[in-house]
């Protein structure tokens, strides 16, 4: 998430050093957190033990990764001239291809992506759907359309985004993630839902990054 802010500031200030630092942050997050076999992102990494702790594919972690990576091509002018952007685009493509498999019948994703016993979680679902929408791949269209109904069903008449999990540490096991309450309004739920619906309104105007 910090890399996204750094990149935006770097582009606004025309600060190539800050842009490079932001892309470096993306690059090493990919190397340490994405499983190259599954395409999914782990919730955490222990640099001392050299492992992914409980090894859980947390939904919102995958949403943050997908959403922030999807923004780079539209923010960074001539993104294709930055070698690390190719890593970002490749990582995102593989992640979104993997996530499609785990979309539920309700058009949502679960708080533990690959755990059918964990609950559907709305901030993760909104972030993943927003990333698909921003990426602009026509193969994502049916998953995006399915998400619209699922997300709308979890927004109250007064605009509250419901069924958003609370702040979540790297839990010991899947049961720990299943136990995180989702009864309260959370800023990240409101924000990611707004990002999805706002992107939906301007989807025809999104700047794509070509064949990358």
Predicted regions and their residues:
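Long, well-ordered core segments of solenoidal/helical folds
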Residues: 16-42, 88-107, 143-160
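Active-site cleft segment of glycoside hydrolase catalytic domains centered on the general acid/base Glu
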Residues: 9-17, 51-56
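Short linear capping/connector segments at secondary-structure termini
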Residues: 44-49, 108-116
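Acidic/Ser/Thr-rich, low-complexity mid-to-C-terminal regulatory regions of eukaryotic proteins
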Residues: 40-60
């Amino acid at each position: 998430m910090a890399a996204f802010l750094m990149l935006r500031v770097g582009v606004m200030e025309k600060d190539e050093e800050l842009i490079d630092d932001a892309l470096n942050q993306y690059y090493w997050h990919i190397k340490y957190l994405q499983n190259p076999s599954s395409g999914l992102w782990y919730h955490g990494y222990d640099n001392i033990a050299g492992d992914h702790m409980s090894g859980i594919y947390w939904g919102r972690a995958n949403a943050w990764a997908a959403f922030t990576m999807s923004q780079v091509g539209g923010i960074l002018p001539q993104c294709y001239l930055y070698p690390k952007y190719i890593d970002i685009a490749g990582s995102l493509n593989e992640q979104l291809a993997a996530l499609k498999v785990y979309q539920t019948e309700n058009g949502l994703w679960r708080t533990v992506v690959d755990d059918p016993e964990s609950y559907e979680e709305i901030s993760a679902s909104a972030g993943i759907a927003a990333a698909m929408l921003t990426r602009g791949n026509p193969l994502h269209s049916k998953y995006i359309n399915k998400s619209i109904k699922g997300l709308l069903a979890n927004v109250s008449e007064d605009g509250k985004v419901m069924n958003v999990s609370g702040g979540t540490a790297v839990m010991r096991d899947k049961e720990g993630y299943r136990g995180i309450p989702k009864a309260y309004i959370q800023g990240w739920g409101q924000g990611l839902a707004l990002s999805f619906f706002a992107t939906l309104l301007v989807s025809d105007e999104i700047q794509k990054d070509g064949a990358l």
